[in-house]
Amino acid sequence: MDHKDYIHPAEFSADDYGEIDDPTGFESELLSSEVADQHFAVIDPQNSLRARCSVWWRDTPCLHGERVGTIGHYAATDSTAGRAAIRQAMHCLRAHGCATALGPMNGNTWRSYRFIVDRGTAPPFFLEPTNPDSWPVDFTACGFDPLSWYVSEINFDIANRQPELGSLRQKMDRLGVQIAPINVDDSADDLDGIYDVVCASFRDSFLYTPLDRESFRGIYEPLLQKIDPRLMLVARHAGRVVGFVFAPPDYLQQARSIDTIVIKTFAILPDKCYTGLGRVLIVDMLHNALDMGYTTAISALMHTENRSQKISSDCAGPMRRYALFAKSLTS
């Protein structure tokens, strides 16, 4: 392929996608719904997209007290074009005062971020980001290094491999914690409580950014319409939500029989009296899944330093590894 003068990333808009051939299948409405600050594309002489990425320098995470910019919506059919787009994104973020670039990240960790770096043999699962092996290489070729690591783990035998509870069930019973499926007749009230738990539980997490209540509902309400309420359990105590676990079926198995749930999110209020509640929620979720005919559970996209990964490792094995990359823009 001839990489001549056309490899110059240009600013691009959602409307421009209607004028080109896009083999990456980008959903251009994401530029507005995910509030990208700028978008770049490399178009070849045949009017075909070779690479694209967006940048965010507003409402992004902090890292070591410094301002961070992020590079997301990345795709490339050609590494030379992809790396040109990444370098243009870095130049843009530097010009807007960012000390560090993170990627891939669509603005913040509420949206898609991370690359698969160790694929394993298992097929993709529901809500998992995916990428060709070449895309992380494009970032490292531009000077990025892994900043944080994440894993997904799989338990092929949820009937016999579950977290140990010891006396935790009795502890929660004595406290008066009640666990039940989300209230489908008043899911808005439960979602408000879940939002409060998420904000309290994750506020000290790595690269956390606040999310308003309405945007949180926008993420979860469409998912709730698809799943059986037994796969979203809510823990309540003294009239408020104190924890939850969300584990939709692996809908990417629809071409064959679905036998797997994806434990996507669980969170507990950071109060010592609720220590161990996460394990109880997971066990109750696995019991529900078994009753519904599921046999396998994926613990999805866990930071390797998080307690959720420690709970998962008791009964699940390695499946996939991911990384988020970073590069200083000040040196």
Segments from the language model and where they lie:
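Acyl-donor binding region in acyl/amide transferases
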Residues: 64-143, 256-315
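Short beta-strand-to-coil "C-cap" segments at the C-terminal boundary of structured domains/repeats
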Residues: 155-158, 326-331
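Short hydrophobic/aromatic beta-strand or adjacent loop that forms the aromatic wall/cage
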Residues: 37, 148-152, 319-325
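Generic recognition of stable, solvent-exposed alpha-helical segments in well-folded globular domains
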Residues: 81-84, 134, 189, 193, ...
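Acyltransferase donor/substrate-recognition loop-hinge adjacent to the catalytic core
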Residues: 129-206
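Conserved hydrophobic/aromatic beta-strand scaffold that supports enzyme active sites
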Residues: 73, 152, 232-234, 244, ...
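A conserved beta-strand-loop-helix scaffold within acyl/acetyltransferase catalytic domains
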Residues: 6-45, 51-63, 181-268
